[in-house]
Structure formats: structure tokens, C-alpha cells
A protein has these predicted regions:
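Immediate post-signal-peptide N-terminus of mature secreted/exported proteins
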Residues: 24-73
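N-terminal secretory signal peptides that target proteins for export/translocation
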Residues: 1-6
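Short E/K-rich amphipathic alpha-helical oligomerization segments
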Residues: 57-100
């Protein structure tokens, strides 16, 4: 499930990329070059965010599936010692998947925050005041 807050930076970047020619008319040649350089960094960062989002989503699905497997194994825990061992193994896998998901989520949020800051810097520097 994609979050609307992750889509917003992408839409902002697209609008900014389309607005560069209009903004360039009001800037000096030196500022225009700097803005073009800033603009060139936005697309790769946007692609990285998309990849990170896909990775996070895949890890979320994996953690969810392992969580369900753990719950199923937990129900049978008291039936035998082998079921208890299976439940312990399922819990360990689930915990590992949750940690991987949490790390991916944190990295994605950090990258999105930085991307939003870069877009704000671009807007501040490269968009003429009205």
C-alpha cells in the first residue's frame, strides 16, 4: 500500500522540472547553470526513492506473511516439543523480517526528507519571486 505522502515529492519534482524553462528566463546565466545542475540531481534521487519504496513494500509483505506463519505455529506450540521449536524458529524469522522492514522504512523516510529539502532549496533558489 503506497502512502500519499510519498507521492507528493514526486509530483512536486515533476512540476519543478516542467517549470525550469520559465524560471530560467528570470535568472542570470550563472544561476541558470546552477539550477540546471540542481535539477539534474532531482531525477536520480526520485528514482532512488521509487526503488526504496518498492523494497520497503516487498519487505512489508514478507514480514506480514512471516507474521501469519508465526501465528499459525504459535497455535500449535503446546502440542509437542517439535511444534515449540518450529514456533521459535518462525518467531526468529518474523523478528528478522520486522527489523529489515523497519530499517527500510527508516531509510525511505530519511531519503524522502532529504529529497523534500532538495526540492525546497530548488524552489527557493530557482523559482522567481512573484
Amino acid at each position: 500500500m503506497r502512502r500519499p505522502s510519498m507521492i507528493r515529492p514526486f509530483l512536486v519534482a515533476i512540476v519543478l522540472l516542467a517549470a525550469l524553462p520559465a524560471a530560467a528566463d528570470a535568472l542570470s546565466p550563472k544561476q541558470t547553470e546552477r539550477c540546471k545542475a540542481m535539477q539534474a540531481t532531482l531525477a536520480p534521487k526520485q528514482a532512488e526513492l521509487l526503488e526504496a519504496t518498492e523494497k520497503r513494500d516487498a519487505l512489508a509483505e514478507q514480514a506480514e506473511a512471516l507474521g501469519e506463519q508465526f501465528e499459525d505455529a504459535q497455535v500449535m506450540r503446546l502440542a509437542s516439543s517439535s511444534n515449540a521449536q518450529a514456533a521459535d524458529a518462525a518467531k526468529a524469522e518474523f523478528d528478522t523480517a520486522r527489523r529489515a522492514f523497519a530499517q527500510a522504512e527508516y531509510a525511505l523516510q530519511s531519503s524522502a526528507r532529504q529529497f523534500n529539502q532538495d526540492v525546497a532549496d530548488y524552489n527557493r533558489s530557482c523559482t522567481p519571486a512573484k
